[in-house]
């Protein structure tokens, strides 16, 4: 009985360490400002309002080490029920840059695209809107970004 109890305790401890490591890895590679994702924009609003909407600090939750703000309690609850449905692709970095050369480039949270139920964010400053470039070669850039993003975790 002691052996089983020890094995169970070890398994629980191991899972806890793995979860902590995953959270630390996400924090290292996600596009965060002071631990905050999407520059404080509500990830659910992109899907339900089809626009970027600033979230509120009082409606914040943390998911696997990443802090998200929400514009409404309804959006917060939707995220809690299915966080991976609403999290941005490529850790919230510019999808175009990830596909073009595998680089982490900041984004304009109001420049986005929903594609196959996933949120893609883009750089849009100084006369450069990378969403336009993405749209010209979306299939290739998405394929490349899907290959490049996991490489950053190695």
Where are these regions (language model features)?
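Mature extracytoplasmic domains of secretory-pathway proteins
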Residues: 69-71, 75-88
